């Protein structure tokens, strides 16, 4: 049987950045890696209802900087920033160094594979028909500008005795094209019949110029207002 490589892993350093960006000596590397794992595990558990897409970690000069990408920043920040302060103290305690937490808003959650997968999983747990949940996610993504999307669910679908897989695709999802910007993620729906796995691939377009183009797009301010062209006036 043909197997699929992880779309993010094969594109690291080509069009996908690392989720942890730091350098360490040989003796510190394992401790830093374990610290990153514990921080991510803690934040994903604490912010399970906050629609967290991804968590990036930097370690400048004996400190840790955590950026939480979320579709619901208000829940993460809390009233007058109380919740984010609690998170900062907890992360600092886990990592053993001073912590800084930044919040980045995900503008279009319908185009984020993690959030789409979580949404489908939560619908399956609420006994929504799996075909309806898949079709709704695909239509929303295509309406908001995705070039293509594929959704796959597997398990005891609809309470069937025998587990099976079903998938739905719209547009194109070129997994072999390394310059293709493909967002991929998974989720699990824990139902009364058992666990149902959800996989989502979203193709957002091709990135020309590699990591330099990715870095430039991240530095540019989002939704910069465009100036209206001036009229030529009367001749």
Swiss-Prot record:
UniProt keyword annotations, A-Z: Ribonucleoprotein, Ribosomal protein, RNA-binding, rRNA-binding
Residue span of region Disordered: 215-235
UniProt keyword Ribonucleoprotein present: yes
SMART domains, per the entry: KH
SUPFAM superfamilies: Prokaryotic type KH domain (KH-domain type II), Ribosomal protein S3 C-terminal domain
Listed GO biological process terms: translation
Similarity comment text for this entry: Belongs to the universal ribosomal protein uS3 family.
UniProt-recorded name of the protein: Small ribosomal subunit protein uS3
Organism in which the protein naturally occurs: Haemophilus influenzae (strain ATCC 51907 / DSM 11121 / KW20 / Rd)
């Amino acid at each position: 049987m043909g197997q699929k490589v992880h779309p993010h892993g094969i594109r690291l350093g080509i069009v996908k950045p690392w989720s942890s960006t730091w350098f360490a000596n040989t003796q510190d590397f394992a401790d830093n890696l374990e610290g990153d794992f514990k921080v991510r595990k803690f934040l994903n558990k604490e912010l399970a209802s906050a629609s967290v897409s991804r968590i990036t970690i930097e370690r400048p000069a004996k400190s840790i900087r955590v950026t939480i990408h979320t579709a619901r920043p208000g829940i993460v920040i809390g009233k007058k920033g109380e919740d984010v302060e609690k998170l900062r103290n907890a992360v600092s305690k886990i990592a053993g160094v001073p912590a800084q937490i930044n919040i980045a808003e995900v503008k279009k959650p319908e185009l984020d594979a993690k959030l789409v997968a979580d949404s489908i999983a939560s619908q399956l747990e609420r006994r929504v028909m799996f075909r309806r949940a898949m079709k709704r996610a695909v239509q929303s993504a295509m309406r908001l500008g995705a070039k293509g999307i594929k959704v796959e669910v597997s398990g005891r679908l609809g309470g069937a005795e025998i587990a099976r897989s079903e998938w739905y695709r719209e547009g194109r999802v070129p997994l072999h094209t390394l310059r293709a910007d493909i967002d991929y993620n998974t989720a699990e729906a824990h139902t009364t019949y058992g666990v149902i796995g959800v996989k989502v691939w979203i193709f957002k377009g091709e990135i020309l110029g590699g990591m330099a183009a990715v870095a430039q797009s991240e530095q540019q301010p989002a939704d910069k207002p465009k100036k209206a062209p001036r009229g030529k006036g009367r001749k």
